[in-house]
């Protein structure tokens, strides 16, 4: 998937017995968004760690927010979305919009099996410095198997202004190797002097 400018993240609690059905329905819903709202891609997965462990997350990628506006119009008329909501087994409790800034990371077209979402607090005046650190360490992600990387700022929610890094991986082993190398990198150490990580979750793509 190519670079995009906006990422939409929606989190829901879902009855375990309904997950297989919801995964099937979300596949159909995703196709509708790509075909008719201009979504550049979607991801659907289960959050395995952190405060939202056990919840499901739906991630959408857009070039502009006009696409997301179209997505909301489709949502209001979608029989698939209505079926999910009418089931009484899924409850959306979080939806945030994040920017996605250009980075030096070359995106792969291969679909990841895992995504690591990291949220950090830092001053807006440190945005360029933060982005430089991400670009300086981009090879650490790529060399250890990372497939996709998105970095930006949250525009909505209780953590507005926080920075969000989402990285897609083919395996848990690739995640482990990446962080082993990152911890020893000077730019990562610099990053930790002005940014405070307040969330890191691992998502398994369904």
What label would you give each PLM region?
Residues 1-206:
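Short S/T/G/P-rich N-terminal loop/turn motif that feeds into the first structured element of a domain
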């Amino acid at each position: 998937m190519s670079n995009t400018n906006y990422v939409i993240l929606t989190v829901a609690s879902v009855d375990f017995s309904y997950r297989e059905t919801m995964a099937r329905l979300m596949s159909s819903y995703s196709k509708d968004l790509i075909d008719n709202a201009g979504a550049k891609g979607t991801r659907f997965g289960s959050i395995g760690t952190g405060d939202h462990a056990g919840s499901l997350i739906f991630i959408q990628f857009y070039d502009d927010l006009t696409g997301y506006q179209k997505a909301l119009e489709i949502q209001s008329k979608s029989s698939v979305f209505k079926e999910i909501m009418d089931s009484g087994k899924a409850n959306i409790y979080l939806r945030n919009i994040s920017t996605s800034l250009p980075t030096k990371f070359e995106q792969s077209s291969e679909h990841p099996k895992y995504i690591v979402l990291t949220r950090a607090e830092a001053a807006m005046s440190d945005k360029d410095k933060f982005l430089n650190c991400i670009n300086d360490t981009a090879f650490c992600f790529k060399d250890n198997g990372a497939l996709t990387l998105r970095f930006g700022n949250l525009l909505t929610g209780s953590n507005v202004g926080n920075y969000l890094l989402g990285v897609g991986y083919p395996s848990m082993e690739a995640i482990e190797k990446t962080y082993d190398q990152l911890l020893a990198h000077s730019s990562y150490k610099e990053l930790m002097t002005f940014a405070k990580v307040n969330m890191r979750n691992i998502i398994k793509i369904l």
